[in-house]
Structures are given as C-alpha cells and as structure tokens.
From Swiss-Prot:
Reaction catalysed by this enzyme: 3-deoxy-alpha-D-manno-oct-2-ulosonate + CTP = CMP-3-deoxy-beta-D-manno-octulosonate + diphosphate
Name of the protein described by the UniProt record: 3-deoxy-manno-octulosonate cytidylyltransferase
Record's keyword annotation contains Cytoplasm: yes
Pfam families: CTP_transf_3 (PF02348)
Length: 250
C-alpha cells in the first residue's frame, strides 16, 4: 500500500523547549523519529516545523522539511498545511507521527495506515493498547478510548472510562478488562484532514484538550484497532530523556 508520513515538530514546547533537538544517544531526537518513519515503508516522509533551528538540523541529516505557519493549534493543522503545500491528493493517506516519539515501532505506522485503507467508511484511524494498571486508568495524562464491536472509537477521555458502576469510586478493585489507552498516532485521508483543519474546535475538544473529539463531534468515524506492538516511551518532560536513552541503547 501507499502512504505518507508527516512529522510535526515544534521548538516552543511548554514543558520542554527545544525538545526535537534534544540529543539522545548522540543524535537529535527528531532524527531518531525520522529514521523510524523511513523504516515503515512510507513512500514519502516529511518533517513539518515552524522553526529554522529544527529545519536546519533536519536538512543536515537529509530529511525533507516544510516550514509551516507558527500559529497552528495542533499537529493535524500543521500537516494539513503541508498537504496543501506539497499538492497531495485528497485520497492520499498520511500518518501523523509526533516528533517526540523516538521509540515508535515502524510496524505500527504501517498498521495505522493499513487500518484506514481497509475501512473506507473511516475518516481517520488511530491505535490503542490495553490498560494494565489502575494507576494508568486514573492518570489524566493517559487518554482512554471506548470502542464499538467493529473497533470504531465511541469516545476519548482523560477520565477513567468506561466507569465501573459496580465499584463506584473504589476504583482500586475495578476490573480493567476492555479498558484501553489511546496511542497518539493518526492516519487521515488528506481530503478529510483539510476539512478537519478548517473546522472550529468543539466544546468537548476544548474541555478535554483532545483534538480527535473534533472529528467525532463532526460525525466522522475513527477506526481504532489494538496496536500490533506496544509503542515505546515518548519524551514529554526532562525526566523522560534518561529513560529513553537507556531504551535506545538496549
């Protein structure tokens, strides 16, 4: 199958400024992410950034880079600009690989693109993995997803969904069967991506700070199978850097 990968990379991260250029194992993080994308079989890999410090480094290791507007609200909006700039067709499939995920298995990039290609009624595809601990279930930084019988997403939330009415607030004794954590990896058809970027954020998106709720609110279907491999540790805060370096060396 044919698909593209776009890697949105911002310099002005609130919690970790300059994050894409952090050195991990002798290479900037964005280079590790780019190498994962190249290994997945995509026909085209592009880094989308609003900062020349990132573009200069990326072009230095041979990446294709598109400089974008600095005022996009999300990575999806940034990739929509790239799709327009490069003249991608509306039926092209593009995978959004975040620039702070240097341990993403290449196989799941192919998996999410293939899931979208197979489900022609879906506007987007993403992935999930089973939740393994109550701590994950309660962590608002772990986004939960509930799905229907055909693996289409019904809702995403930072809250512990589905809520187990039988145990109420005594969540330490709840069953985690059927509970899933969302992986922030997306595939879109370019035509829908452009329409998505033109939509105003909905109240649910603004409340949860989850852009995929904009798509659900608009009536779009999101296919969400279980990932074939568990994704690696991302880099959100400075304490993640040492852990990721150890995993890269393993």
């Amino acid at each position: 199958m044919s698909f593209k990968v776009a890697i949105p990379a911002r310099y002005a991260s609130t919690r970790l400024p300059g994050k894409p250029l952090l050195m991990l194992g002798g290479k900037p993080m964005i280079q590790h992410v780019h190498e994962r994308a190249l290994a997945c079989g995509a026909e085209e890999v592009v880094i989308a950034t609003d900062d020349t410090r990132i573009s200069d480094v990326a072009e230095g290791f041979g990446a294709r880079v598109v400089l974008t507007d600095a005022h996009h609200e999300s990575g999806s909006d940034r990739i929509a600009e790239v799709a327009t700039e490069l003249g991608w067709r509306d039926d092209d499939i593009v995978v959004n690989l975040q620039g702070d995920e240097p341990l993403t298995p290449p196989d799941i990039l192919h998996q999410v693109a293939e899931a979208l290609e197979r489900h022609t009624d879906a506007a987007m595809a993403t992935l999930c993995t089973p939740i393994e601990t109550v701590e994950q279930m309660l962590d608002p930084n772990v986004v939960k997803v509930v799905r229907d019988a055909a693996d289409y997403a019904l809702y995403f939330s930072r809250a512990p969904i589905p809520w187990d009415r039988n145990v109420g607030r005594d969540v330490t004794h709840r069953s985690l069967e059927g509970c899933h954590r969302h992986i922030g990896l997306y595939a879109y058809r370019v035509g829908f991506l452009k329409a998505f970027a033109a939509m105003s954020p909905c109240a649910l998106e603004l409340t949860e700070r989850l852009e995929q709720l904009r798509a659900l609110h608009a009536g779009a279907r999101i296919q969400c199978p279980v990932a074939s491999q568990v994704p690696g540790q991302g880099v959100d805060v400075s304490s993640d850097v040492e852990r990721v370096e150890k995993l890269l060396r393993a």
